[in-house]
Regions:
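Acidic, proline/glycine-rich intrinsically disordered inter-domain spacer in sigma factors
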Residues: 8-11, 99, 104, 111-135
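C-terminal edge and immediately downstream basic/flexible tail or linker adjoining helix-turn-helix-like DNA-binding
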Residues: 2-9, 24, 105, 129-136, ...
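Amphipathic, Lys/Arg- and hydrophobic-enriched alpha-helical face
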Residues: 37-55, 71, 134, 185-186
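Structural recognition of an alpha-helix C-terminal capping motif at a helix-to-coil junction
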Residues: 59-66, 79-91
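Arg/Lys-rich amphipathic alpha helix in sigma70-family domain 2
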Residues: 70-77, 87-108, 122-123
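Short, charged helix-capping/linker segments at alpha-helix termini
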Residues: 3, 26-35, 45-63, 166, ...
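Sigma70-family region 2
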Residues: 26-27, 50-54, 63-80, 99-103
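Helix-turn-helix DNA-binding module
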Residues: 135, 139-143, 151-168
Length: 192
C-alpha cells in the first residue's frame, strides 16, 4: 500500500460507479464491494495513517472495510458512499483512539514519552516530512489537526465528534501546529 500520498477524492463527490457497486454489494456481490474497496482504500488509509500513525494504519484500514461490509445494508444513499464511508472510518478511528488511550493509562504513558524523546535525539539531522511529524503529535493534538486541517471539519463538528468543547478543539489545534512547527523547522533550517 502506498503511504506517501492518499487519494485526493473529496468525500462529497461521488464516484460514478459507486451507486451501482453499492447496490450490487448490498445484495451480496463481493466483486462490487472489491471495486468500492479499490476506489476508496487510499483515502481511508491516508486518514488512518494520519489519525493513528503508521503502525496500526493498515490494520485499521482493513477494520474500516470489514465494518463497511457489515453495515452496508444501513447505507441508504442519502449522502455519497464516500461520505458515508468517511464518517464510518472517522468513528472507528476515534473509537480505536479511545481504546488505545485506556490501554496506555494501564501500561503507563512514560514509556511512550521516553520513546518519542529517544527517537528525536537519535535522528536530529534527518529532515522530517509532514506525515512523520503528524505521526509524532500526541494523540489528541493529532486527531484534531487531521480532522480540522486535513479533513476540513469545523471546530464545532470536531467538538461534537470528540465530546469536547469548541475551545478545547481550538487549543489542541494551536498546540498541534506549534508542535509541527517545532518538528519541521530544524529540518528546514539545516536541510536547505
Amino acid at each position: 500500500m502506498d503511504d506517501t500520498a492518499p487519494a485526493v477524492d473529496s468525500p462529497s463527490r461521488p464516484v460514478p460507479a459507486d451507486a451501482v457497486d453499492v447496490a450490487l454489494a448490498q445484495s451480496g456481490d463481493q466483486q462490487a464491494f472489491e471495486r468500492l474497496y479499490r476506489a476508496h482504500v487510499g483515502r481511508v488509509y491516508g486518514l488512518a495513517l494520519r489519525m493513528a500513525g503508521a503502525g496500526p494504519a493498515e490494520e485499521l484500514t482493513q477494520d474500516v472495510f470489514v465494518r463497511a461490509w457489515e453495515k452496508l445494508s444501513s447505507f441508504r444513499g442519502e449522502a455519497a458512499f464516500a461520505t458515508w464511508l468517511h464518517r464510518l472510518a472517522v468513528n472507528l478511528l476515534l473509537s480505536e483512539r479511545s481504546r488505545r488511550g485506556r490501554e496506555r493509562l494501564r501500561l503507563g504513558e512514560d514509556e511512550t514519552v521516553m520513546d518519542r524523546q529517544r527517537a528525536r535525539r537519535e535522528t536530529p539531522e534527518v529532515a522530517m516530512d509532514l506525515d512523520t511529524a503528524i505521526g509524532r503529535l500526541p494523540d489528541g493534538a493529532r486527531q484534531i489537526f487531521v480532522l480540522h486541517d486535513v479533513e476540513g471539519y469545523k471546530h464545532e463538528e470536531i467538538g461534537e465528534m470528540l465530546g469536547i468543547a469548541v475551545g478545547t478543539s481550538k487549543a489542541q489545534l494551536h498546540r498541534a501546529r506549534m508542535l509541527l512547527r517545532g518538528h519541521l523547522e530544524p529540518g528546514l533550517k539545516g536541510g536547505h
